Structure formats: structure tokens, C-alpha cells
């Protein structure tokens, strides 16, 4: 290359024998311009171009498919990544990690694989074929990049879909190998990088250039020095890290100093001295104080710029010449590189969204030791176990010959255990970055892969913001289960042909679409006939478990219609969302005639669990129900204050009770009125303050229901019309009215010294404009509330409770506050007073919850339905003896003595699609019921090996005899622990001669350990249905006797726990030594040699996750189960590239305004007042804020371009920002004779007028976008040439505006000389500004 430099010896240039890429070529040309100037540089560059073309022609490099060489390591790298993904998928299937953790690990695994392949690509080319055309072209700097070559011979990895979500299926193939059909479809998401994207980007960049040029087309260099002393500071050290030399040099080179620079009292640079390469390197090397430089944004020249504020020209490196159109150059410099910017940040390769962390590795083999008290267990972002330390943690690595001590910073993850042996280079800790980037919360929905029932643990609570919905929150990390089962249901109310636990075959009728009659049960009629005939017209026995004893369990509300037996009330159940409402209907045959009865609603949670002070029932008295709008006034009612411990909870309204809502007795008043909300003012046919009669047409389609005074008030976009019934009184003296304004007048009081009120009345003073005031005298409705609870029905509370400890407290509540306005909508009546029945008992350790059950008891042909509430630590299982009749169907059939005959029409029957066992379930969404059929495919049998210790222990325990004891357990119908419950206790089953259900953790009564024995041959399923086949099947005594007798075996001293009935087990658990589990599920039956497991899918949910649905709810495949909330790190704004530049140039809002903005301004004003001693510090802060906003805007735009590898001088952006911030908005009327409030004017113009008139001008600084700034200039010709031509010209003509033709555009439109370049001197001569600048000297 030495022959290209004829002046090389004179300049003493060194000879470099190395490859020149694009960056090195730029540096070479820059140095040539600085040393030899533009002429020699152009000559040398032309010779380089010619030499390059000649060498390329001689080489004749072509690209073929054989030149695409894939790295040999790709095979095992992809295989290793797939193995990692398989392990992660298995952990997710076992419930060890949730979906977000699995996605994170998948992303990082494939990202690392893709990056390893990228790093292996270049060494592979160098070793195999250094002169490979693909290798030379990719690193030549002319065309192509490593990213494109990586797609040709490497892999793409994970990509994003159009919504920004990562597709969990990596693209493993490259273009050389060929994409599969699935990979090709996924790759189509990146089509925005194709022809359409290029066209859109080119047009957007062109329009952006046009807008920017419109803003600054009049900016021309017309002075040498404006005399300003302002500028900006350039910090050589920013924060804790030094700025890169490249950015510092780009900022300093070509600038002019605004102040002298000193190093240790020695001046190394003076004001107005331009900064070259040597001075810039000297300032960086000496690390001088922040450099104060001049900038175009602080130039004092009006509508122009001076040479010293602009600095050196980027073209030739000298101080800018006079007459240079720097505005147009700035607009084009910013807009033209827009074609190189991407529309989004994700385009070619995979996406990595991991945490910013640094790994700490072990330097040698050894044992890790640290203090376990200083760490606590946690989970990594991949779901792996780890430890986290709050403070600095000292770790010692003890090797064979050496000891290494290191300290881990706080909030770091420790990936090893104490006293664990680690190998060299093993990761032992993960230290997070000190400055963590901003995070955003993302929601991920998890969908069900199985059809069945939803189950969860006690770590789930109801979401308070969704009181009436089906949304629940996870209290801490736990599992959610979907138990398998086939769903059968219908939109109509279905009539089941079978009962729970019946066996059905394929195509067997399950239900019939038929309405159920009203079949309430009372004490006058207790006997019912059983339907003995089958549904097929012939005698056919349906296989069932009716021959064995069964447990009637209504914990999950298996019966749809249940009845509470009482004296005067018939109760029918109705399923509504997550609560079981039992409306009470009064029996007119036994009640008082002509008296409306109150409506009692029993409110029991779906799981039957009630806490202390929970609302048990609600009584709505129809006497306190209104059908018209009005105002509530507290009269003489007595208000009782309620403490926090006795707060009444239950429904959404009760949660908001204030301390004065509970009433002891008295009277309250209701002032009726008619209210209408209107949206069209033109449709109103009456006037405000007019008096109308009942039936008057007030709008086109509304007639008034009452007569009275019309009051019309506009509230935002709506119109409220109120009709106040009553009389109108015009008083003689106005001063006497104020005493009675807005007050209630009791009966018998003299009013206005003229008449006496007979009833309660309400006075309201109205003063219409320009008319005589008057007073509407409105009628008042009086309601009385007794001191004690008024439950008119003889409700038998003794039947509803068990034991003396349980109590029912009654309280009356007024649902609305004093003076609250009530509005009736859609003619729906409103209840004013509500009576609450609240459960209460003495608080004990063993009785923390109450469990309610709707049970059906049948003895000697008599069926009784009772609601029982029992106090226990855990749910109670009720045992009952069903009558053994061969023709017995379900409990529904036993109630239908007056039902319509059942038709055998085949078309209206629901047929079974599977063979299996029926389980009747209530349908959450419909009024009818649903049937779930557990087919053989939903269950699996696990056989215990005869040689295993489990089997031997069972046989030995069966052969052993034990003593039988009898104990009595108190309680109505008997008390037994429910095995299939959601309590956290584990009920283990031990083997003896009689299988013992050992309740080891919490007995029902007392603190002793009770072991309830079930006979040897038994079957217990997940529905808590226990069936025994032994000789002791009839040992249970009369059902209505409060004392129950159960056989109890002697507790085995060394029982061998095996499994628990109803236990949910995961697939990874090993029960049998020979046969692994086929999948996760629930144990529904235990036999001597085998287990029956109901298959299930389990999902791990983290804390604060949302569960959609109820416990035991039917879930279809594809339904939303969980919504996980997790945080991910932002990589800047979502909008990047060209759209981000456009957003910044148009001054659109990026982030939301802080809610504490006013408080922040007050704090800043207080600080400025303390510093300056003046209360006007806010004005100084306003100036500083605008200067900092300019710098921030410049940095934001530069950040976008630098992230895409585009270099733009700061001076171009500063010129644009200067014009965007050059206008102010007049906000006061102090100079109303000069400027109008709301007018946009130049800041310099406002300052000159302020100095001329010696009067303060109040204005606010404005940040205008490029479009608006182009339409608010001093030249209406330039505005009309941009957009809205007709409007701009018409307004300019009406306002009589004058265009002084100072810009380039208006002179071009009118055909004049452009005031720039060679036309600059002539424009100065004609404008009469000879004294400002001398064209010969430029001063």
C-alpha cells in the first residue's frame, strides 16, 4: 500500500500489513483527511477502490452451496440442548417447575447453544478453509454479517411471534441443511425483514427527513460569535464507569470551549478554542474536570447560528464557513440513516431474556464451607434449589493443598450446599449485578391438558377483588391438580337415571331432558314411594353398590336439591357460582293469612367450611324493600359500634360495613323521589323547576310516575332529572327559611308560624335565578325497627346446630348511610334493612372451623333432610345406613311420588360414551347437574410385589390377632375424619387384622390418639364412600341416636405406613419396587395387593398466581387454569429503531407521568429556596429543567442510532432539539396588550419584549414535535408548503401576516435567491445588515 502514499516519507507513516475491515477503513480515511486534506484523500481513496476491484476480478470469487460448511460440533451441541430440554420437561411434568421456569431454562439453553455455534463458526472456517468465499465475504466489511452467515451454517434458535411471545420450538436447522415445514412456518414470523419491511422503512425514513428539514430549513450560519456564555458540560467519568473513548472523542472533537480548562492551576485550553484530536486525547488522558463546551442549542443568534457555537464542519474538519445551511444538513443527517434502522429489535437470531448475573466458579477441587444460619432456601429462576444470603457471606474452599476464601455479595444465589465437594470450574454462586435494569410484570396463562375435576390444597384463598367470581389466589407455592374423568351434561335440566357410583356400559342412557317438578318436603308428608320400575320397560337390574353400607357425604354438595326440615319453611337449593344459596319459602298452609313472610337465605360456602363470625344466613324482610328512588335519613335508630373482632363478614356489601351500620332499634326515614338518567338534552320535554302531574310526558318515551317539582342537573355527559313529590310553599320571609332548609320536621311541629305538620316532612330551600324562592314540602315514609331481632318464623335452631357451644347471633343492619341517595335501576327493588345470622362459639384450639352438611337420612321408609353444623378441627364425615332395596335408584327418585311418568323416548336421552363408574357432580354454569364417568382409561391399578417388604408386612399383620374395643363418639350421626379432604394432615393407613385408619395428627375430640377401625374387607374411594363386606356390617346403631358405636382395634405399636386414601401422589414417587407409577394421580382404593389410582395432571403455581375456577369444578380440555405473574427484565422500550426516533422527534409521551409530580415539584422548590434564599427558585428550576430535557432528548436519540451501529454527530441532533424547544406558551394576562394567553411565540421574542416594556411576562416552556413546529413558524409560505395549504393561507390572509422570506424554502417557492452559500452575501447586502458581519473578514 506504500505506493498509494506519495507523501508517506514526509509524514513518516508506518507500514501496516493487516486486513482492513469497514471500521479500519473509516479510521484510515479520517487520518488521511487530518494529515493531507480532502484533495489527497480523494486521490488515495480512488486508488484504493480501483485496486480493490482489480483484486476482486482476478480472484473471481463465487458462492456455491458447497462453500457453506456447518461446524462439526453442532450435532452434539443440539443433542445436549435437547437433553436439557427433556430433563426440564420431565421436571415440569412431575410438578417440580412451573411453565415460566421451564420457558426460561429453554430460552437460555437454546441461546447458549446458538452462541456456541456462532463462536465455533469462525475458527472452523480458519482451520478447514481460510479462503472460503463465505468466510471472506462475511468478514470483508462490504456486505453481509456474521449474523447472516450464522443463519446459513449455524442455527436460528428461538424466535418471537408477532405478539412478542417466544415460540417454544427452536429452529435447529440452518439454510444449508434445509428447514422443515414447521421451522419454515415459524421463520415466516420474521418476514418483516423482507421486501415489505424495507419498503415501509424507506418511506418512513423519507417522511421523517422531510419533517425534520421543514423544522430547521432556515438555520444558516450568519455570525462568527454570538457572545453567549452558556453551554453544556461533558463529564469524562460518568457514574462508576468511564465513558468509552470513542463516544467521548465524538462528543469533544470539533467543538469549541465555552470556558478555560485548568489542570492544577495551569491553563491548558482557553475559551473559544476549538478542540482537535490532540487536545481531546490530552483532556481524556489528564482527566480534567467536566469540560464546558458551546453547543447549537444555547446559541443566542435569532433564527440562525454562529460559527463558534456550531464548531468544526464534519466535512473538512475546519471551522464552519459563513452561509453554510447547517439546518438542512442536520435534518438529512438524522433522517437518511433511518433506512438502516430496524423497525423492531428482534429480527434475525434467537432472543435471550435472562437476568444479568456473574458466575463464581471454584478455582480448584475441594469442599465448600459456609455458615448455614446466614442463608435461607429459595428457588432460582429455573426452579432449581438454591440458597440466598441477605448480607455478605464468607465462603471457604478447602482443597488438598490450599485454602481459598471468597466473599459473596448480598442478594446472591449460592448453588451448592454446605460441606459439599465441588470440582474445578464448577459454578458455586451467582452474583447479580448491582444496577439491575428495569423490570416489567408479565402474565402467562396455563391451560388444562386434561378433562376432569379441579383440586388444590389449602394454600388457595378467594381473591378479595373478585368476591362474586371464581378467581382465587395462591398464598404460597403449591400444586394444582386436574383429576381425570369424562364429562356428560346438557344445557337443559337433566334427570339422572343412575345414582352415584353406579356402573354403566357404553351407549347406556344416563339422563333425560325433563323439567323437575316442585317437590318440597314438609312434616305433613314424609313418606315417598320408590320408583321400582326401570327405564327400559322391562325388569333389568342395574349394578350398583346399594347392597353395602354407604356413607352419605355432602361435603361437595353432590345433591342438587336439598331440604331442611322445619315447622313453617320449605327450603330448596339453587346452585349459583361459588356459593350455595337456599332460598326460604313460607308455607301458607301453616302461616298467618295475609301477612307477607320474610325471605331467609342460607349462605354456606361451597366446601361447607365456616369460620367464626361468618354469616350463616340472611333474612330479607319485604317490609323494608322499596321500589322507588330516594334519600335515607337516620331518625331515632340506635347505632351500635362493632369492633374488628366481631366484624360481620359474608358478602360484598357486608365487607364494607361501617361501625354505625348495626342498629339496636328505632325509626329511620325514607324520602321518595323519581330519578331518570338521560343522555340527550334535546329529548327533554319539561323545564327545570317546573311542576308536573303524574303521567306527564317528560321525554319522548318516558312518562312520570309521580307528580311534583322537576329538577334537572347536568353531570358530565349525562343529565339527571329528579321529580320531587309534595307541595310547594312560597314563604313571605326568606330569612326564616334557612332554619328549615334540608331538615326533617316531626309530626305536630308548627312550620313557618302558619300550619302544623301531621306527618314527617322534609323541607328543601330552592332559589331559582331571577325568581322568587320557594320551599318544596316533601312527604317522608317512616320505618320502624324493634330493639331485638324480629324473626317472625319459628326457625328451629336446635335442629341446625350440634352441641351447646354453637350459637347463632342475630343483628339488623341498615345497608345505606345517613343522607345516602338511593337510585332504583330497571325497576329492581332495593332492600334497606337486612338481618344477619352469624355463627359463634367459644374459641378453642381444637375447634377452629364449623362444617355444614346437607344430609338425607332415611329410616323405616321415612326420609328426613337436615342441615347439620359441627365444630371440629377438620371436616367431619357422616355415616348413614341406606335401606337395601333392589329397586332403589338415586335419592332423586325417592322424592318423586307426584312426578310425571318417565318416558322412554330415545331421542331425549343422554347416552354414555364410556364404560365406567358414575360420579354425580353439580354443574357450575347451568341450573342442572353433570355426570362424570370414570372409565378404565382414567384409572390405573398398581400391583404390590409379593416379595416386597410392603406385602410381607401386610400378610403378617393380617395373621395377627388384636383386641377389639368399643368406644362411644359423641355427635349427631357420628363423627369420623374425612379422608378425601383438603386438610394438610396426612392420614396414614396401617395394616392389622382390621385395617386401621390412624388419625395421628389431630383427633376429633380431646388430645388422645384415636384409631377408627374399618373391618378387614372394605373399599373406600375418593368420594369418602366406605363399603364393608365383613360380618360386622350392621354394628352401627340407630341413626337418630346421638351416641354412635364403632368397633375400634388396638393400636399397633409399630405400624408400617404405606399410603393414604385420597392421597395425591406424583409420578416420581416410588410405591412398588417392581412397577413404576403410570402417572400422577389420586389413590381412590386400597386392596391387600394393589392400589387403584385415578390419573391426574398436576401444575405448579407460584405465590400470587391466579386460579380460575372453584375447588371440585368441572374443567374441560383447553380451559384456563392458572395465570402466573412473573417479572422479566426490559431491554429498553418495546418501540425501537425508526419508530422510536419518530416518537422522540414528535415529542410523544413515552412513560406515564408520576403520580407524585406535584410533591416532587414542591420538594425541589423548597430545596431551591433554601439554596438561593428566594421563593422564586422554581423559575430557576424551570430553566434548568429545560436545559436538562434538551440533553436527555439528544442522548435518547443518539442511543437509538448507536444501538444500530449508526454514528451521527451530536450537533445535528442539537439543532433539531433547539427548534423543538424554542417556543413558549403565554400563560398569563400581564401583557394582554402584546400577547394573548395561549399564544405560541419565540422565547427570544418574549425576552426582548420583556426587556423593552420592563414588565414580567408569564409563559411556560413547550416541547413541540417536528410536525407542530413546522406549522408554527414565522413564515406562512413555509407552513403552507408543508401541509394544510388552504387553511394556512386563509388564516394568514385574515390575520394580515407578513412573511420576511428569511428561510430557504420560502425563497425557493417564490423563485428568489436562496440565502445560503453563494447567495448568503447578497442576502446580507439587501437586508441592510452591513454593520453586523463584514463579508470580507467574517466579523
From Swiss-Prot:
Its EC number is 2.7.7.6. The keyword Nucleotidyltransferase applies. Zn(2+) binds at residues 226, 299, 306, 309. Keywords: Chloroplast, DNA-directed RNA polymerase, Metal-binding, Nucleotidyltransferase, Plastid, Transcription, Transferase, Zinc. It comes from the Eukaryota. One of its GO terms (biological process) is DNA-templated transcription. GO terms for cellular component: chloroplast; DNA-directed RNA polymerase complex; mitochondrion. It catalyses: RNA(n) + a ribonucleoside 5'-triphosphate = RNA(n+1) + diphosphate. It is an enzyme of class 2 (transferase). Binds 1 Zn(2+) ion per subunit. The keyword Repeat does not apply. It holds the Pfam family RNA_pol_Rpb1_4. GO terms for molecular function: DNA binding; DNA-directed RNA polymerase activity; zinc ion binding. It is found in: Plastid, Chloroplast. Its cofactor is Zn(2+). Its main location: plastid. In plastids the minimal PEP RNA polymerase catalytic core is composed of four subunits: alpha, beta, beta', and beta''. When a (nuclear-encoded) sigma factor is associated with the core the holoenzyme is formed, which can initiate transcription. Belongs to the RNA polymerase beta' chain family. RpoC2 subfamily. PANTHER family: DNA-DIRECTED RNA POLYMERASE SUBUNIT BETA. HAMAP family: RNApol_bact_RpoC2. DNA-dependent RNA polymerase catalyzes the transcription of DNA into RNA using the four ribonucleoside triphosphates as substrates. This is DNA-directed RNA polymerase subunit beta''. It comes from Cycas taitungensis (Prince sago). The gene is rpoC2.
Amino acid at each position: 500500500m506504500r505506493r498509494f502514499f506519495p507523501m508517506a516519507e514526509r509524514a513518516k507513516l508506518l507500514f501496516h500489513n493487516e486486513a482492513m475491515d469497514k471500521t479500519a477503513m473509516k479510521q484510515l480515511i479520517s487520518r488521511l483527511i487530518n494529515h493531507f486534506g480532502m484533495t489527497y484523500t480523494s486521490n488515495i481513496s480512488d486508488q484504493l477502490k480501483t485496486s480493490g476491484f482489480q483484486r476482486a476480478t482476478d480472484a473471481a470469487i463465487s458462492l456455491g452451496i458447497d462453500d457453506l460448511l456447518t461446524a462439526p460440533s453442532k450435532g452434539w451441541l443440539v443433542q445436549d440442548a435437547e437433553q436439557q430440554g427433556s430433563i426440564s420437561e420431565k421436571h415440569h411434568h412431575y410438578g417440580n417447575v412451573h411453565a415460566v421456569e421451564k420457558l426460561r431454562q429453554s430460552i437460555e439453553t437454546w441461546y447458549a447453544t446458538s452462541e456456541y455455534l456462532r463462536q465455533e463458526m469462525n475458527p472452523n472456517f480458519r482451520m478447514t478453509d481460510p479462503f472460503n468465499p463465505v468466510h471472506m465475504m462475511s468478514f470483508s466489511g462490504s456486505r453481509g454479517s456474521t449474523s447472516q452467515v450464522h443463519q446459513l451454517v449455524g442455527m436460528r434458535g428461538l424466535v418471537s411471534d408477532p405478539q412478542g411471545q417466544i415460540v417454544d420450538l427452536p429452529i435447529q436447522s440452518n439454510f444449508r441443511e434445509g428447514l422443515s415445514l414447521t421451522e419454515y412456518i415459524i421463520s415466516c414470523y420474521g418476514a418483516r425483514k423482507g421486501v415489505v419491511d424495507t419498503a415501509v422503512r424507506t418511506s418512513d425514513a423519507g417522511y421523517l427527513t422531510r419533517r425534520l428539514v421543514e423544522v430547521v430549513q432556515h438555520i444558516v450560519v450568519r455570525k462568527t460569535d454570538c457572545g453567549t456564555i452558556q453551554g453544556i458540560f461533558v463529564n469524562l467519568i460518568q457514574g462508576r464507569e468511564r465513558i468509552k473513548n470513542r463516544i467521548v472523542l465524538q462528543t469533544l472533537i470539533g467543538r469549541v470551549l465555552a470556558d478555560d480548562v485548568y489542570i492544577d492551576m495551569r491553563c491548558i485550553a482557553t475559551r473559544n478554542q476549538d478542540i482537535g484530536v490532540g487536545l481531546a486525547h490530552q483532556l481524556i488522558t489528564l482527566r480534567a474536570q467536566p469540560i464546558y463546551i458551546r453547543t447549537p442549542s444555547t446559541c443566542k443568534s435569532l433564527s440562525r447560528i454562529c460559527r463558534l457555537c456550531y464548531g468544526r464542519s464534519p466535512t473538512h474538519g475546519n471551522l464552519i464557513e459563513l452561509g453554510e445551511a447547517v439546518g438542512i444538513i442536520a435534518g438529512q443527517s438524522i433522517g437518511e440513516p433511518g433506512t438502516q434502522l430496524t423497525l423492531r429489535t428482534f429480527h434475525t437470531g434467537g432472543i435471550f431474556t435472562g437476568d444479568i448475573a456473574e458466575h463464581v466458579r471454584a478455582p480448584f477441587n475441594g469442599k465448600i464451607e459456609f455458615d448455614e444460619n446466614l442463608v435461607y432456601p429459595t428457588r432460582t429462576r429455573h426452579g432449581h434449589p438454591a440458597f440466598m444470603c441477605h448480607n455478605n457471606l464468607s465462603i471457604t474452599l478447602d482443597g488438598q493443598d490450599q485454602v481459598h476464601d471468597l466473599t459473596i455479595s448480598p442478594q446472591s444465589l449460592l448453588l451448592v450446599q454446605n460441606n459439599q465437594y465441588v470440582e474445578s470450574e464448577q459454578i458455586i454462586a451467582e452474583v447479580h449485578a448491582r444496577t439491575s435494569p428495569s423490570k416489567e410484570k408479565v402474565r402467562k396463562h396455563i391451560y388444562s391438558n386434561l378433562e376432569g375435576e379441579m383440586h388444590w390444597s389449602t394454600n388457595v384463598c378467594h381473591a378479595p377483588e373478585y368476591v362474586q367470581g371464581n378467581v382465587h389466589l395462591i398464598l404460597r407455592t403449591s400444586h394444582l391438580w386436574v383429576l381425570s374423568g369424562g364429562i356428560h351434561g346438557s344445557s337443559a335440566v337433566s334427570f339422572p337415571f343412575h345414582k352415584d357410583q353406579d356402573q354403566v356400559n357404553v351407549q347406556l342412557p344416563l339422563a333425560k331432558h325433563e323439567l323437575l317438578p316442585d317437590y318440597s318436603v314438609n312434616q305433613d308428608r314424609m313418606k315417598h314411594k320408590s320408583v321400582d320400575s326401570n327405564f327400559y320397560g322391562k325388569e333389568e337390574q342395574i349394578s350398583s353398590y346399594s347392597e353395602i353400607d354407604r356413607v352419605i357425604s355432602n361435603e361437595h354438595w353432590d345433591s342438587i336439591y336439598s331440604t331442611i326440615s322445619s315447622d313453617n319453611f320449605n327450603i330448596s337449593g339453587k346452585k349459583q357460582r361459588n356459593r350455595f344459596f337456599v332460598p326460604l319459602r313460607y308455607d301458607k298452609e301453616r302461616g298467618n293469612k295475609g301477612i307477607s313472610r320474610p325471605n331467609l337465605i342460607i349462605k354456606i360456602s361451597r366446601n361447607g367450611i365456616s369460620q367464626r363470625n361468618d354469616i350463616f344466613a340472611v333474612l330479607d324482610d319485604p317490609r323494608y324493600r322499596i321500589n322507588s328512588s330516594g334519600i335515607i335519613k337516620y331518625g331515632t335508630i340506635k347505632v351500635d359500634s362493632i369492633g374488628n373482632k366481631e366484624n360481620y363478614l359474608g358478602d360484598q356489601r357486608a365487607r364494607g360495613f361501617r361501625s354505625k351500620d348495626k342498629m339496636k332499634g328505632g325509626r329511620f326515614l325514607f324520602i321518595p323521589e323519581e330519578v331518570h338518567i338521560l343522555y340527550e338534552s334535546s329529548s327533554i320535554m319539561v323545564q327545570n323547576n317546573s311542576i308536573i302531574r303524574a303521567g306527564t310526558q317528560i321525554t319522548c318515551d318516558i312518562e312520570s310516575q309521580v307528580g311534583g317539582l322537576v329538577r334537572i342537573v347536568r353531570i358530565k355527559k349525562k343529565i339527571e332529572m329528579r321529580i320531587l313529590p309534595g307541595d310547594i310553599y312560597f314563604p313571605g320571609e326568606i330569612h326564616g327559611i334557612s332554619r328549615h332548609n334540608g331538615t326533617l320536621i316531626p309530626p305536630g311541629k308548627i312550620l313557618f308560624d302558619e300550619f302544623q305538620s301531621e306527618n314527617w316532612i322534609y323541607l328543601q330551600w330552592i332559589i331559582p335565578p331571577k325568581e322568587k324562592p320557594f320551599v318544596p314540602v316533601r312527604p317522608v315514609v317512616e320505618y320502624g325497627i324493634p330493639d331485638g331481632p324480629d324473626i317472625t318464623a319459628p326457625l328451629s335452631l336446635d335442629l341446625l346446630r350440634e352441641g351447646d357451644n354453637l350459637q347463632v347471633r342475630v343483628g339488623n343492619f341498615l345497608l345505606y348511610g345517613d343522607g345516602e341517595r338511593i337510585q332504583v335501576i330497571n325497576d329492581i327493588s332495593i332492600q334497606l334493612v337486612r338481618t344477619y345470622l352469624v355463627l359463634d362459639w367459644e374459641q378453642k384450639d381444637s375447634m377452629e372451623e364449623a362444617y355444614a352438611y346437607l344430609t338425607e337420612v332415611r329410616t323405616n321408609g321415612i326420609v328426613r333432610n337436615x342441615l347439620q353444623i359441627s365444630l371440629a378441627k377438620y371436616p367431619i364425615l357422616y355415616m348413614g345406613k341406606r335401606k337395601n332395596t333392589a329397586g332403589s335408584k338415586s335419592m332423586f327418585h325417592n322424592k318423586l311420588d307426584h312426578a310425571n311418568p318417565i318416558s322412554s323416548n330415545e331421542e331425549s336421552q343422554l347416552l354414555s360414551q364410556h364404560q365406567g363408574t358414575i360420579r354425580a357432580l353439580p354443574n357450575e354454569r347451568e341450573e342442572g347437574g353433570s355426570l362424570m364417568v370414570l372409565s378404565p382409561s382414567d384409572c390405573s391399578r398398581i400391583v404390590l410385589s409379593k416379595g416386597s417388604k410392603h406385602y410381607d408386612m401386610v400378610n403378617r399383620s393380617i395373621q395377627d390377632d388384636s383386641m377389639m374395643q368399643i368406644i362411644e363418639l359423641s355427635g349427631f350421626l357420628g363423627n369420623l375424619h374425612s379422608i378425601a379432604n383438603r386438610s394438610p394432615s396426612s392420614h396414614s393407613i396401617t395394616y392389622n387384622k382390621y385395617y386401621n385408619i390412624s388419625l395421628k395428627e389431630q383427633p376429633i375430640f380431646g388430645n388422645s390418639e384415636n384409631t377408627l377401625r374399618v373391618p378387614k374387607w372394605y373399599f373406600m374411594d375418593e368420594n369418602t364412600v366406605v363399603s364393608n363386606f365383613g360380618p360386622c356390617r350392621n354394628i352401627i346403631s340407630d341413626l337418630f341416636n346421638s351416641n354412635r358405636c364403632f368397633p375400634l382395634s388396638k393400636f399397633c405399636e409399630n405400624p408400617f405406613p404405606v399410603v393414604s386414601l385420597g392421597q395425591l401422589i406424583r409420578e416420581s414417587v416410588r410405591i412398588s419396587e417392581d412397577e413404576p407409577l403410570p402417572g400422577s394421580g389420586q389413590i381412590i382404593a386400597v386392596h391387600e395387593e394393589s392400589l387403584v389410582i385415578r390419573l391426574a395432571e398436576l401444575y405448579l403455581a407460584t405465590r400470587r398466581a391466579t386460579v380460575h375456577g372453584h375447588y371440585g369444578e368441572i374443567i374441560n380440555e383447553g380451559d384456563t387454569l392458572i395465570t402466573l405473574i412473573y417479572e422479566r427484565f426490559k431491554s429498553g422500550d418495546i418501540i425501537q429503531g425508526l419508530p422510536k426516533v419518530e416518537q422522540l422527534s414528535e415529542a410523544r409521551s413515552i412513560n406515564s407521568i408520576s403520580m407524585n409530580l406535584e410533591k416532587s415539584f414542591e420538594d425541589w422548590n423548597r430545596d431551591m429556596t433554601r439554596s438561593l434564599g428566594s421563593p422564586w427558585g422554581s423559575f430557576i428550576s424551570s430553566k434548568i429543567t429545560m436545559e436538562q430535557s434538551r440533553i436527555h432528548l439528544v442522548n435518547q436519540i443518539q442511543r437509538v442510532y448507536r444501538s444500530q451501529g449508526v454514528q451521527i454527530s451530536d450537533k445535528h441532533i442539537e439543532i433539531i432539539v433547539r427548534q423543538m424547544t424554542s417556543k413558549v406558551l403565554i400563560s398569563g394576562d400581564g401583557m394582554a396588550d402584546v400577547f394573548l394567553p395561549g399564544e405560541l411565540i419565540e422565547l427570544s421574542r418574549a425576552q426582548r419584549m420583556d426587556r423593552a416594556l420592563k414588565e414580567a411576562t408569564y409563559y411556560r416552556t413547550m416541547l413541540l414535535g417536528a410536525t407542530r413546529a413546522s406549522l408554527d413558524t414565522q413564515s406562512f409560505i413555509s407552513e403552507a408548503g408543508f401541509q394544510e395549504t388552504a387553511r394556512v393561507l386563509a388564516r394568514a390572509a385574515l390575520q394580515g401576516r407578513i412573511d420576511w422570506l428569511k428561510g430557504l424554502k420560502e425563497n425557493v417557492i417564490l423563485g428568489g435567491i436562496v440565502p445560503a452559500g453563494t447567495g448568503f452575501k447578497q442576502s446580507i447586502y439587501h437586508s441592510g445588515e452591513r454593520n453586523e458581519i463584514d463579508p470580507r473578514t467574517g466579523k
